[in-house]
Every structure is written in C-alpha cells, then in structure tokens.
From Swiss-Prot:
Chain positions recorded as substrate binding sites: 75-78, 97
Function: Catalyzes the aldol cleavage of 4-hydroxy-4-methyl-2-oxoglutarate (HMG) into 2 molecules of pyruvate. Also contains a secondary oxaloacetate (OAA) decarboxylase activity due to the common pyruvate enolate transition state formed following C-C bond cleavage in the retro-aldol and decarboxylation reactions.
Signal peptide range: none
Domain of life: Bacteria
EC number, as in UniProt: 4.1.3.17, 4.1.1.112
Cofactor binding summary note: Divalent metal cation.
Binding sites annotated in the UniProt record for a divalent metal cation: 98
Swiss-Prot/TrEMBL cofactor(s): a divalent metal cation
Keywords noted in UniProt: Lyase, Metal-binding
Name of the protein: Putative 4-hydroxy-4-methyl-2-oxoglutarate aldolase
Reactions the enzyme catalyzes: 4-hydroxy-4-methyl-2-oxoglutarate = 2 pyruvate; oxaloacetate + H(+) = pyruvate + CO2
Enzyme's top EC category: lyase
Sequence similarity: Belongs to the class II aldolase/RraA-like family.
Length: 164
C-alpha cells in the first residue's frame, strides 16, 4: 500500500484536495496519514517545538513557514521529540536541516528543501489556525494523506475498506 493517493483519488475524487507545492521527502516514513494540527510561523520554530513536544498519536503537523529558505524549521532533535510523542509526520512549507539523520527516522517529514541554519527562538507564531499552502486552505482537524505521489487533504476521515 505504498501508492495510497492514486487509489484515494480514484475512489474519493470530490473529497480530496492535492497540495500544489513541490514538497520533498526527508523522513524515513513515506506513507502516513492523520489528523491535521497547524502552526504558522516565520523563521522561528518555537511553536513547532512546542507542539511536537506534546502527544500527537495519529496526528500530522503542517507548518506554514512562508516558504522561507533562510532558516530550517525542523532538525533531528525536534524530529526525535515528534517520534517520541507518537506523531505520524511533519509537513513544512519551509526547510529542514540534519537531512541525512532525518532519513533514518520512522517519521514522515516533507519540506521544500534542506539548509543547515537553525532559527532564532523568539516564541513567535500561531498554533491551530487556518493556513494557506499554494492557494489551498488547511484547517486544524482536517485529515491529511501522504505518499510518494503527493500530499492531499480532506475535510473528513476517509475509509480505506475498498482497498481490500
């Protein structure tokens, strides 16, 4: 079941929206899904760290970092915290660091690219607010489905029973 999205789009074409940004896979987990939690921030990952330090069983954090390539919003330490707290994955409209290490983690990590510089910690940003990614509105509580074909969101949890 590595190609989930083609089957979901075939079965639920009107219930899914594809995120149009060119995300790259960095984590070791390439297939994941879960309830959306959002963070909106710019070159400050304080809120990303705060959210991923909380229990996230069955959830995926989607971060709108404004697409900035000047600072990495996720590295190995925060990703380790996410794994330890049961998060399914992290999707970032921005950049990550520690790319080689992230590839060994059992965590879904998708971002626009990698760069080595960390952020400042100014405790700025917003948690669980609607965000815009490539003209698509992503709201907390939505569902996200990810595989190597792309990233799609839905207003509701989709049943996979038809795959059997």
């Amino acid at each position: 079941m590595l190609d989930l999205l083609p089957d979901l789009f075939d079965h639920y074409p009107s219930k899914l929206t594809l995120l149009p940004l060119a995300f790259r896979a960095f984590g070791g987990k390439r297939l994941f899904w879960g309830e959306v939690v959002t963070v909106k921030c710019f070159e400050d990952n304080s809120k990303v760290k705060e959210v991923l330090a909380q229990p996230g069983h069955g959830k995926v954090l989607i971060v709108d970092g404004g697409g900035s390539s000047r600072r990495a919003l996720l590295g190995d330490l925060i990703a380790q915290s996410a794994m330890d707290n049961g998060w399914q994955g992290v999707i970032i409209n921005g950049y990550v660091r520690d790319a080689a290490r992230l590839s060994s983690f059992n965590l879904g990590v998708y971002a626009l690219g990698a760069m080595p510089m960390k952020t400042e910690k100014l405790d700025q940003g917003q948690i669980n607010v609607p965000i815009e990614l490539g003209c698509v509105t992503v709201k907390p509580g939505m569902m996200v489905y990810v595989d190597e074909n792309g990233i799609a969101i839905s207003e509701e949890s989709l049943n996979f029973a038809f795959l059997n």
